[in-house]
Each structure stands twice: as structure tokens, then as C-alpha cells.
Amino acid sequence: MNKSKEALVITIIQDDTWRRRSAIDGTGSNTVGLREVELLSMSLRNLLGLHPSSPELAQHLSLLSIQTQTPQIKSYPDAVYFNYFSIGLSLLFSPENGYKLTTGLKSHELDNDKLVLESIYIYNVPPRNASHLRSTASAETAYSTYPDFPLVLVLSTDMRDKDGTRPPKLNVLADTSGKDFVLALGEPDRKGGGAGPSSGSIGIWCEWSKDGVMVEFGGEEAKGPQAWEQGKDAVWKIITIFSPTR
């Protein structure tokens, strides 16, 4: 997307802020028009490359929740995560210009001007029960489900499936399954997971590198020796958005 179109999307979203702020029902949940949701999710990729303190990023986060979001900071030598548990979002920032990170840095110790957003993780958390809590990593159970659906994935226009056609976008819902992703995006460029007994294996995952999308799947259908046969019915658990490879 060129700069003028990117600016237009950001402007439209900013103009809609007052509607988002006032669209609260009696239960305290956000009620957002479909067009606004599409603009919001389509703008996710435009956030890549921004600094943690950028106004555009702050604006986007304010649209996702009526409450001010304070992230949990997890820093490592090569990256730092800003985890927004209550809105099902995690942002991975990478250092640039020779900036050196260390493990365990606090927010005030970071040089935000030397960090750029490299990847966006979006979480979809199924209803929790005892068996789910026992079999799911504590880091994942801390997240709530991303609040705005459909999540619109804009697909590369340079790609074609075996029939020579491809939709320009995929509207992802909370129950979108493996077969839905493959039907829209075609066979993945990379995939893995699912090996071993279901109790000890990781879920299957697929990556469409040229679209800048990776999808991890959850549930019993995504694990075990039969995972790739049953995976078509597995619902997504985490979607990662990153810069497409060419």
C-alpha cells in the first residue's frame, strides 16, 4: 500500500474514533460497524515498521478497547514483546541501528525510537474448561480473544491458485478452520507440527510467506499422528502477520 492510501486508511479510522468511543451497550461491550472493523483489521499490516510510541499504533490500540491498554513487556537479546492480554494481541519489536537489547528490560528502559514492529500476533481463545487448561500453555491461557471480527487478511494479488483465481481478501471469524484458509490462500509455503501423540505434540501450523501470514491451529484436531488428516476442521488459535517475502 502506498503512503497516500495508508494515510487515507489511518484518517478514516481516526475519524471513526468518536463513534467507537460512544458505541458501548449496557453490558460494556463494544459495538462496531462492519465497515469500521474491516478498516481496522486491514490496517494491521500498515503498523509493521512503526515504533512502540508511534501515534498510529496508539490510535489503533485505542480503537480495540475502551480502556487504556498497558502491555506486559518481555525483552530478550534479539526482540521485545508488548503483550496486550485483554485484547488478544502481542506485538514483536526488533532492534535496529545497532541497538542492543538484554533480557528483562522494563518499559522505561527501552529506546523506543530504535525498535520497529516486526510481527503481530492475534489470539483466538476457545471456551476454557479443565482439560483445556491442563493441556494449554499458561502464556496462551492468559490471552483473551481478539475483540473485532471479521479479521480481514488482505491477500497478495501476485499469487494464483491452481484454478487461476484467488480472492483479494479473507474474512477470518472466530470459527474459521483450516479448510477455509487453504481454500482462500491455497497450499501453504511452509507447514509443521502435529507429530507424536496428541497429548505431547504441538498443533499444526501453516505459513503463507508471500502473504505474510502464519496460522497456528488449536483443538484436538490439530494434534497427534492424524493431525494433517483432521486438521481441515481445526480452528485457528494464533494468526501472525509479518512483512511478505518476495
Give the residues covered by each predicted segment.
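A cross-family detector of function-defining hotspots
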Residues: 2-246
